[in-house]
Amino acid sequence: MALKGQEDYIYLFKDSTHPVDFLDAFRTFYLDGLFTDITLQCPSGIIFHCHRAVLAACSNYFKAMFTADMKEKFKNKIKLSGIHHDILEGLVNYAYTSQIEITERNVQSLLEAADLLQFLSVKKACERFLVRHLDIDNCIGMHSFAEFHVCPELEKESRRILCSKFKEVWQQEEFLEISLEKFLFILSRKNLSVWKEEAIIEPVIKWTAHDVENRIECLCNLLSYINIDVDPVYLKTALGLQRSCLFTENKIRSLIYNALNPMHKEISQRSTATMYIIGGYYWHPLSEVHIWDPLTNVWIQGAEIPDYTRESYGVTCLGPNIYVTGGYRTDNIEALDTVWIYNSESDEWTEGLPTLNARYYHCAVTLGGCVYALGGYRKGAPAEEAEFYDPLKEKWIPIANMIKGVGNATACVLHDVIYVIGGHCGYRGSCTYDKVQSYNSDINEWSLITSSPHPEYGLCSVPLENKLYLVGGQTTITECYDPEQNEWREIAPMMERRMECGAVIMNGCIYVTGGYPYSKGTYLQSIEKYDPDLNKWEIVGNLPSAMRSHGCVCVYNV
């Protein structure tokens, strides 16, 4: 009882279990057929007895149907065409449980139904599922699917793969069946990743030759969208070599003239990718993020890493996000399990879910829409444990242990296989490992496939043109590995020795950044570029500061 002259005593009771109990009660009503007031019928004839209020609360489609002046408002049975009963059952169960199972088999049908019936949360979950499973062999179809159903994230990320890996994409069977409009859309992208004439002429010829009778008249239109110089001799030869494209000399000459008419063309360089330098070490840990466009040779600075005292972390890129995993702090060598994620589009950092195993000097790569953390050091000894982060499930998942735990090794992905090369093994890195370990995610198995010609640690590896390149280390030796032939070959040596450098592929070339040449005892600031066509290295610029042990990744512009 309140004292005289004071406000009434108020106690606000809030039952935290009420929302769950409330939903459970309606679930029971649904299962028992109690208080139902609407029936949904599939084309197969299967019916579901539901509650209008529950459907309207989850679906804008049903909310509009039951509140607007529509004939269905007064009906007790609603017939829904074009929706399989399994899909409708899943959506109805979601309305009563807040859960729905999404699989590779049902995801597209489920998204279509969720889009139609405006179950917006389910549609978004399906969209994220499809983004998680994007690859070169489905990105064209997914891009069209995303455009039709207005899925902005799926559209953007499928376009990112389509443009950044165009050479691999056009060699897929799916490419031959695309429409002229879709092909023109691809060619018109300013960020289409092409760096050779044949890289863009070949798919045009291949697509035309696939259905030459119906597509031959499209050829001139396609060529007019190519924003690079086209060699008339090369074009004539390419057309002539396609036996299904048999033209008269006049027809070839006409095609060449129209395609190369400057009134129809805009010759320009394509800005396809941007290099991100994350942190690093220069006598102390660095926390800066530096962003470089190789076309303009301009550096800009991004938001700094929030945890600025750590070093020897793993860095990898997944879509627009850059993941920084593990490492250790300067004042001790205790391995960390912390994860920071940098969004390159918003220039913002967020803290991610900690890894299952703390580690430093480990390898980090992306494969199949997931982020992998492999090996590294923990308590002075190389770790065999490996794990991956599934951004859809928002959890780290352990995988099979590596055959040999290694620290300060290098890893990259080629044809959906992870390769881990070299590194230190033994307590506190007492010896160097000479084997190449490969991981097949389909069977969750590691294998030893070959030996490195010169075992080292502190190297970088990158995939290019179906081959794996080893750069950096204590020498200037650069080597190329062909997995199909299981052969190594030495290529042109680098200009500098670069221990713990960074390396990335951009526009068909290898860029190697910074590093530490033990012979000189200084940190490097320069950037070397390797052109595989010329088999030649050259200095093409400088980092904002000298550094080693930094993250170096490429984000493709969309």
Swiss-Prot record:
<keyword id="KW-0880">Kelch repeat</keyword>
<feature type="domain" description="BTB">
    <location>
        <begin position="36"/>
        <end position="104"/>
    </location>
</feature>
<protein>
    <recommendedName>
        <fullName>Kelch-like protein 23</fullName>
    </recommendedName>
</protein>
<feature type="domain" description="BACK">
    <location>
        <begin position="139"/>
        <end position="240"/>
    </location>
</feature>
<dbReference type="Pfam" id="PF01344">
    <property type="entry name" value="Kelch_1"/>
</dbReference>
<feature type="repeat" description="Kelch 6">
    <location>
        <begin position="510"/>
        <end position="557"/>
    </location>
</feature>
<dbReference type="InterPro" id="IPR000210">
    <property type="entry name" value="BTB/POZ_dom"/>
</dbReference>
<dbReference type="InterPro" id="IPR047068">
    <property type="entry name" value="KLHL23_BACK"/>
</dbReference>
<dbReference type="Pfam" id="PF24681">
    <property type="entry name" value="Kelch_KLHDC2_KLHL20_DRC7"/>
</dbReference>
<feature type="repeat" description="Kelch 5">
    <location>
        <begin position="467"/>
        <end position="508"/>
    </location>
</feature>
<dbReference type="InterPro" id="IPR006652">
    <property type="entry name" value="Kelch_1"/>
</dbReference>
<keyword id="KW-0677">Repeat</keyword>
<feature type="repeat" description="Kelch 1">
    <location>
        <begin position="274"/>
        <end position="320"/>
    </location>
</feature>
<feature type="repeat" description="Kelch 2">
    <location>
        <begin position="321"/>
        <end position="369"/>
    </location>
</feature>
<dbReference type="Pfam" id="PF07707">
    <property type="entry name" value="BACK"/>
</dbReference>
<dbReference type="InterPro" id="IPR017096">
    <property type="entry name" value="BTB-kelch_protein"/>
</dbReference>
<feature type="repeat" description="Kelch 3">
    <location>
        <begin position="370"/>
        <end position="416"/>
    </location>
</feature>
<dbReference type="InterPro" id="IPR011705">
    <property type="entry name" value="BACK"/>
</dbReference>
<dbReference type="InterPro" id="IPR011333">
    <property type="entry name" value="SKP1/BTB/POZ_sf"/>
</dbReference>
<dbReference type="Pfam" id="PF00651">
    <property type="entry name" value="BTB"/>
</dbReference>
<dbReference type="InterPro" id="IPR030566">
    <property type="entry name" value="BTB_POZ_KLHL23"/>
</dbReference>
<feature type="repeat" description="Kelch 4">
    <location>
        <begin position="418"/>
        <end position="466"/>
    </location>
</feature>
<dbReference type="InterPro" id="IPR015915">
    <property type="entry name" value="Kelch-typ_b-propeller"/>
</dbReference>
